[in-house]
Amino acid sequence: MLFQTKRIILRKMTAQDTEIYHKWRNDIDVMQTTSPLLDVYRIEETEEFVNQIILGSCSSKCYIILEKQSKKPIGITSLINIDHKNRNAECIIDIGEKEVWGKGYGLEAMKLLLDFGFLEMNLHRISLRVFSFNGGAIKLYEKLSFQQEGRAREAIFRDGVWHDIIHMAILQSAYIEQMREK
């Protein structure tokens, strides 16, 4: 079913989600592997970001990941920079609740997002960027049939060391082929 599995539901992000997003955005452990800029944000800055960048954009679709049984928000996933003419988008995901890390929620959420992007929006290509030191995410994306397309060498400075940003993407045809094989 679109936007839910046995364990999670994706629902549209609203302004009421700002507080939980603010908590995740200020958790260095959560943002360490996904955000190029680590900082501490005031609630007003997060409110402005949510209203202008997330909710105010006509080129993105942003969803809160809910644990189905408890209805507790556990993360956020989005299609951003949606280009309707060329049928391309970029995807992002953050699992904000650390107690559910490593339990497969990210994989489920990404599958739902890809289903929506490819089977409902009829996108041709979905891309992402991942830090080279985020091995778990790279394995997850490869499991979903994302292919490495390139890398921005030494593009992120984290903990005193330069790291690459890996560019990955999956085409609609590859995604549909993968679905047939399963």
Model-derived regions, located:
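A short, well-structured alpha-helix characteristic of acyl/acetyltransferase catalytic modules
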Residues: M1-E47, A174-K182
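Short loop/turn microsegments at loop-to-beta-strand junctions
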Residues: Y21, S60-K61, R151
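Acetyl-CoA-dependent GNAT
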Residues: Y41-E99, L171-A174
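Active-site acidic-Proline motif in GNAT/NAT acetyltransferases
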Residues: E97-E99, K103, S132-F133
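Conserved acetyl-CoA-binding loop-helix of GNAT-fold acetyltransferases
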Residues: G102-F116, I138-K143
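Short glycine/proline-centered loop/turn elements that form peptide/ligand docking sites
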Residues: G106, M110, F133-A137, E154-D159
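Conserved GNAT acetyl-CoA-binding A-motif
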Residues: L119-R129
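Conserved catalytic-core motifs of GNAT/GCN5-like acyltransferases
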Residues: S127-V130, Q147-H167, M179
